[in-house]
């Protein structure tokens, strides 16, 4: 009583406290960063290593395996995967959430150093690492085009100057430059000219390497001067290499230009990048795992004027893709939804109270509670994101509830002609416990979420804390500011003797009278109501089992990623043509704004595309509808497939897959994996629940197997090392020397001129110089036959792995897809040597599915404990919790009606309903218990009177919560796919709960009261006279 009086009788202090809360909130709002979702990125580090010319199997066994054994010892590694292709190995390390990325990077570097002695000696450089997830979509793509500069020169400028500058911006984790490679001097050998001159490829290589050296020469000095010695020991251009003498034949000099074409070109000619229809260099920028995407993009944009100033006029720099506009638009939509929710809630209060002064009180309490929450969000290190702002939108209906309960009770005393200050004090005292019970039990719902681990727990933590803080501030405001404003602003008035004169009052009275009549009938037919109650419990169970489920709603971010997978024997020239064809088909779609892509590198038969769609206001279709339309057109392209998927704000795992979800096969036996993977992939492709089924196992590439005749080689004076060196020199794009320049280092690359290596007959032109100096054709000691070979070798841990990726057809949920895959694996009878499991997002979905029921039960149990402590009763909490089944039925039926799967967002809605719908029961039970204690009423009379007296605040609070959530259901535009499931769940649950709990709660109250009396009679002992 004294606590409430302290604020009611000191209005200045109370107002200043509320103003302080508001000002802190405004300051926090201005300082809060902006993000699409809470920070949920796993720390990921990518290790790269190269050995030009090495086969995928060689890379896997000699490079990947030693590194994996060393990296696998690092603490906190959640998953380690590797992919080895021609001349390249990439290892992805995904760490636990709590692992610091910088500490992990130090451990990775130490592990690389420890494995260095086990790696092949011919590697051009040590393995390197990057603190970025290669499977993440770039946050920004910049393109460089030029009419006069070559692609190699553009690439050099991009990688040497632009990429280095951008990488220094806060938040940038990796700048991947694609579309070409660094400039190089390429030496294209003529096998016939070499044979005629008797010059071996090794001799050419050694001559070039010896002629281009960079060594210190020292200095000369006397007593006065010092002269540094400088020589022309370096060759920098193709023109300088052409006259190089590599051999003497009968006293005549054989120059490099006599046996080879020497050109200024690039290190790897098998690379191509495009933007729309132009050749381009792409700078694909990815953020650090812990970085904020908006702040990083803003930092890059702020740097762009400086970058453009340093770019020559012949180069055009453009932003091809930027993830931030749709994120900003989505957050703006949420902010507008929040404003609409506040307005609707205040409108509901006004319609019920029919007083401007009375409405002003909750109209002040709501913004104070919501704005004050921003200060706590800032102190907790949160961000303004879709989930935290949705929490505030939903909180609108909650925070007004507390003010309504206090205000409505004070207004009742004022109608009884009590003085305003006395009415404020008395009314607040009467419902203070009720308000505290409602708020604490609502906050208790979110305690299990705070203890939930993994990605779902990290994702939901900001939502739970934000909503809990808003409710906590609302509780303080409703018990301090609200009664103070009531006491000083409202006046005593006569009871409304003729409320029918006003429309809302007339409707409310009619509803109350109708409710009273129907409630009497229900209390006389309690068994029927009991059957209905049990039916809702059973229906809950059936609906939860039957409803389709998914992890997270599919987002329309306005960005698509595409992975091209062509025939495994395709040439680079043909693959470049496929890229151009696919880009033209996509560019012609009316919903597409921009398209960029690249192909080449270590995987000739694959490519990547990034598509930016027009803003939502300029296109009618969703991203998924655009994909469905393009899928039909793209299927007509022979010899290659393009798999499209919408970029999501949540991407789990480090695998670069051509679809959104993955199923990984593991085996310690590579032959068993290669035998069963095609069978499993074929069976999964036939499932109607899956689309775009593809695999990263590519073991049907064309290979030419050379079989050495070792006896013949020994007789001819040739060893295997010389033969292998011949092949590497001829066909491996071998980097044989380094050209040092002030800004970068460039390579001299040697191979047989492409004119002489167009088919297998090129092998017949190869020869080795034996120990006697004679040219021995390769065909003298080797035979060759075509065979199949892997284009890549993949590992997970230290096991051979193959990942089958898939998308979901429109109308199919992730739960339906995973169930279909599990059934198929059982039907196929896959042996125990091959193990299958979901990975990435699908894996997290299964883990979440296993914990959902536990989470819901834990929330109910927590609420029961809190209510039990507050009421000092085992029974009354059960009465209050009896409101939950009807809310669950309403929520699940609403999701079914809107064809929305049960996702993590819908789970949040269920958790919220646990907190919302019990408020009705709390108000009923509190007044019934008080009526029994002080009024001497029977339980039947007490609960009946409580239902009628609390009918108006129950209707007000429920409608306030319902209208607070309604904008989420009706919202469109960017990010609506996240907001709608939450709104649908809450609105459906509230409607059904309101219809049923007004009748089931009094029946359950009476049931437990009779049960209590029965047990008390059984346990009572007769008085024994002594």
Swiss-Prot record:
Keywords from UniProt, A to Z, are: Cell inner membrane, Cell membrane, Membrane, Transmembrane, Transmembrane helix, Transport
Q: How does it sit in the membrane?
A: Multi-pass membrane protein
List the GO cellular component terms: plasma membrane
Which Pfam families does the UniProt record give? Answer: ACR_tran
Ranges of the Cytoplasmic topological domain: 1-6, 354-359, 412-430, 491-852, 918-947, 1008-1026
Record's subcellular location: Cell inner membrane
Q: Which Gene3D superfamilies match?
A: Multidrug efflux transporter AcrB pore domain, Multidrug efflux transporter AcrB pore domain like, Multidrug efflux transporter AcrB TolC docking domain, DN and DC subdomains, Multidrug efflux transporter AcrB transmembrane domain
Question: Where this protein primarily resides, as one coarse class?
Answer: membrane
Give one GO molecular function term: xenobiotic transmembrane transporter activity
Residue stretches spanning the membrane: 7-29, 336-353, 360-379, 389-411, 431-453, 468-490, 853-875, 895-917, 948-970, 985-1007
Q: Which residues lie on this side of the membrane: Periplasmic?
A: 30-335, 380-388, 454-467, 876-894, 971-984
Please tell me whether the keyword Transport is annotated for this protein: yes
Does this entry carry the keyword Magnesium? no
Which NCBIfam families is this protein grouped with? PRK10614.1, RND_permease_2
Name the family. Answer: Belongs to the resistance-nodulation-cell division (RND) (TC 2.A.6) family. MdtC subfamily.
Name it.
Answer: Multidrug resistance protein MdtC
Species: Salmonella typhi
């Amino acid at each position: 009583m004294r606590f409430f009086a302290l604020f009611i009788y000191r209005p200045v202090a109370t107002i200043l406290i509320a103003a302080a809360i508001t000002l802190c909130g405004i300051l926090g709002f201005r300082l809060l960063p902006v993000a699409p979702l809470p920070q949920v990125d796993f720390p990921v580090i990518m290790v790269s290593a190269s050995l030009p010319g090495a086969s995928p199997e060689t890379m896997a066994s000699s490079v990947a395996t030693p590194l994996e054994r060393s990296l696998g010892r690092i603490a906190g590694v959640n998953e380690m995967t590797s992919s080895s292709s021609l001349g390249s190995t990439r290892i992805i390390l995904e760490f636990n959430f709590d692992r610091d990325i910088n500490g992990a990077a130090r451990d990775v570097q130490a592990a690389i150093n420890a494995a260095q002695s086990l790696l092949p000696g011919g590697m051009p450089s040590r393995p390197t690492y990057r603190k970025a997830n290669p499977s993440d979509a770039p946050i920004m793509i910049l393109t460089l085009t030029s009419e006069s500069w070559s692609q190699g020169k553009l690439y050099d400028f991009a990688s040497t100057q632009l990429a280095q500058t951008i990488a220094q911006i806060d938040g940038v984790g990796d700048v991947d430059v694609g579309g070409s490679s660094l400039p190089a001097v390429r030496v294209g050998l003529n096998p016939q000219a070499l044979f005629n001159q008797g010059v071996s490829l090794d001799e050419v290589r050694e001559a070039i390497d010896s002629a281009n050296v960079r060594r210190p020469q020292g200095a000369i000095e006397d007593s006065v001067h010092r002269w540094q010695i400088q020589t022309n020991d370096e060759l920098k251009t193709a023109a300088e290499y052409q006259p190089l003498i590599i051999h003497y034949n009968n006293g005549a000099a054989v120059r490099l230009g006599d046996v080879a074409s020497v050109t200024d070109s690039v290190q790897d000619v098998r690379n191509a990048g495009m933007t729309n229809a132009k050749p381009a260099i792409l700078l694909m920028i990815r953020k650090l795992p812990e970085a904020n995407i908006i702040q990083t993009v803003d930092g890059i944009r702020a740097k762009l004027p400086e970058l453009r100033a340093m770019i020559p006029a012949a180069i055009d720099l453009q932003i091809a893709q930027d993830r931030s506009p749709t994120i900003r638009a989505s957050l703006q939509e949420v902010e507008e939804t929040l404003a609409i929710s506040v307005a609707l809630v205040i409108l509901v209060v006004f319609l019920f109270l029919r007083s401007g002064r009375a409405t002003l009180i909750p109209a002040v309490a709501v913004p104070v509670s919501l704005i004050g929450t921003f200060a706590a969000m800032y102190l907790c290190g949160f961000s303004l994101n879709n989930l935290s702002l949705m929490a505030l939108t939903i909180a609108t209906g909650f925070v007004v509830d507390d003010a309504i309960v206090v205000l409505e009770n004070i207004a009742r005393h004022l109608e009884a002609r009590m003085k305003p200050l006395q009415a404020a004090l008395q009314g607040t005292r009467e419902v203070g416990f009720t308000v505290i019970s409602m708020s604490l039990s609502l906050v208790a719902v979110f305690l299990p979420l705070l203890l939930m681990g993994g990605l779902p727990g990290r994702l939901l933590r900001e939502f739970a804390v934000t909503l809990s803080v808003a409710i906590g501030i609302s509780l303080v405001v409703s018990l301090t500011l609200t009664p103070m404003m009531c006491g000083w602003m409202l006046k005593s008035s006569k009871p409304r003797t003729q409320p029918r004169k006003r429309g809302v009052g007339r409707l409310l009275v009619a509803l109350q009278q109708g409710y009273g009549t129907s409630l009497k009938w229900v209390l006389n037919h309690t068994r029927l109501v009991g059957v209905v109650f049990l039916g809702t419990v059973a229906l809950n169970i059936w609906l939860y089992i039957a409803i389709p489920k998914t992890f997270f709603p599919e987002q329309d971010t306005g960005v698509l990623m595409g992975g091209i997978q062509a025939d495994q024997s395709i040439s680079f020239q043909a693959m470049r043509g496929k890229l151009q064809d696919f880009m033209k088909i996509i560019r012609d779609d009316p919903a597409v704004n921009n398209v960029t892509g690249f192909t080449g590198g270590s995987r000739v038969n694959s490519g990547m595309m990034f598509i930016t769609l027009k803003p939502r206001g300029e296109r009618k279709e969703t991203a998924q509808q655009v994909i469905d339309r393009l899928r039909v057109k793209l299927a007509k392209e022979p010899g290659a497939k393009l798999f499209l998927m919408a970029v999501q704000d949540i991407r789990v795992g480090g695998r670069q897959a051509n679809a959104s979800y993955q199923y990984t096969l593991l085996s310690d036996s590579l032959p068993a994996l290669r035998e069963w993977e095609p069978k499993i992939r074929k069976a999964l492709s036939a499932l109607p629940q899956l689309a775009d089924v593809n695999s990263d196992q590519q073991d049907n590439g064309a290979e030419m197997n050379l079989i050495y005749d070792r006896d013949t080689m020994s007789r001819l004076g040739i060893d295997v090392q010389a033969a292998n060196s011949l092949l590497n020199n001829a066909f491996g794009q071998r980097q044989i020397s380094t050209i040092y320049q002030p800004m970068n280092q460039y390579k001299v690359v040697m191979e047989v001129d492409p004119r002489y290596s167009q088919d297998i007959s090129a092998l017949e032109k190869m020869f080795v110089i034996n120990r006697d100096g004679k040219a021995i054709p390769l065909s003298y000691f080797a035979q060759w036959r075509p065979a199949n070979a892997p284009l890549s070798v993949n590992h997970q841990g230290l096991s051979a792995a193959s990942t089958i990726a898939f998308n979901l057809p429109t109308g199919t949920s992730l739960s339906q897809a995973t169930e279909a895959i599990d059934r198929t694996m059982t039907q196929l009878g896959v042996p125990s040597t091959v193990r299958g499991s979901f990975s990435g997002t699908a894996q997290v979905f299964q883990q979440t599915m296993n914990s959902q029921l536990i989470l819901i039960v834990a929330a109910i149990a927590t609420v029961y404990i809190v209510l039990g402590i507050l009421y000092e009763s085992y029974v009354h909490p059960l009465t209050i919790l009896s409101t939950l089944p009807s809310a669950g039925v309403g929520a699940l039926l609403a999701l079914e009606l809107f064809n929305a799967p049960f996702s993590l967002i819908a789970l949040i809605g269920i958790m919220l309903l646990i907190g919302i719908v019990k408020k009705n029961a709390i108000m009923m039970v509190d007044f019934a218990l008080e009526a029994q204690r002080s009024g001497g009423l029977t339980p039947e009379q007490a609960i009946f009177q409580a239902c009628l007296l609390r009918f108006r605040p129950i209707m007000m609070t429920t409608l306030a919560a319902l209208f607070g959530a309604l904008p989420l259901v009706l919202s469109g535009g960017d990010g609506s796919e996240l907001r709608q499931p939450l709104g649908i769940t809450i609105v459906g649950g509230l409607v059904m709960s309101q219809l049923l709990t007004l009748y089931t709660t009094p029946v359950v109250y009476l049931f437990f009261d009779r049960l209590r009396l029965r047990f008390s009679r059984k346990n009572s002992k007769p008085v024994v006279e002594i």
